[in-house]
Amino acid sequence: ILKKSLKKIDPINFKELMSDDSIVLLDTRKTDQFVKCHLKDSIYIGLDGRFAPWVGEILKDINTPIVFICELNREREVITRLSRIGFDNCLGYISVDNSTNLELYQETNSLESIDPKIFIKNNSNSKILDVRTKSEYNNGSFKNAINIPLNKIDSSLSYPKDKKLQLFCAGGYRSVIACSILLKNGYTNLVNVEKGYSRIKKLISSWL
C-alpha cells in the first residue's frame, strides 16, 4: 500500500487526475496553514487532531480515491494512518514546505479566521453555527448560536450560500473541517472563530 500510495504528484499530473470528480482532495496540514492558503475544493482534516475518526466520519466510503496534501516528510504518516482505518485508495500526494506554490496546481482559497474577542464584539450581522456535538452544545454555547454538529453539516445546513456564517467548535479544529466542507459545497462568506468555545467562554467570564 505504502509503495503504491507514495507517489508525488506534479502540477501537470494533478490537473489530469482531478478531472475525475470522485477524487477527494484531502488537506492534512496544520489548521493555520489551511486557513492561510489551500487548494480550492479541498477537504481539511488535520493530522494533528482526531484525524482517523473524522476521515471515517466524513469520507465514509473506504474506497474513496484520495489525493492528499501534507507537510514535507509526513507523507508516510498520512498513508499509514489512512490505511489503518481501511482507506487504501491513495492516488498520490502533494507535500508542502515554505517554497511550495500551491497556485501551480489549481486555484487557491483562504479562509477568514478571526480572534474570539472580535467575534464576541461583532456578531450581530450573521448566522452563528456551533459545530460541536449536541451534548457539548447543551452544556453551554454562545447566545443565538445554532447547533449543527460537524458530522451533519453536509446534509443539515440550508442557508443562502452568500450570507455570512460564523462557525466555532471547542478549540478551532472541527470548525475548520466544517468550513472546508461548506466551501466545497459553494458557501462563499464563511468566518472561522479561532480557538473555539473554550476561549470564547473564558473571555466572556473574564469580562463579567
Regions from the language model: what does each represent?
Residues 1-20, 30-34:
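C-terminal accessory/connector segments of nucleic-acid motor ATPases
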Residues 2-3, 31-208:
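Rhodanese-like catalytic fold shared by cysteine-dependent sulfurtransferases
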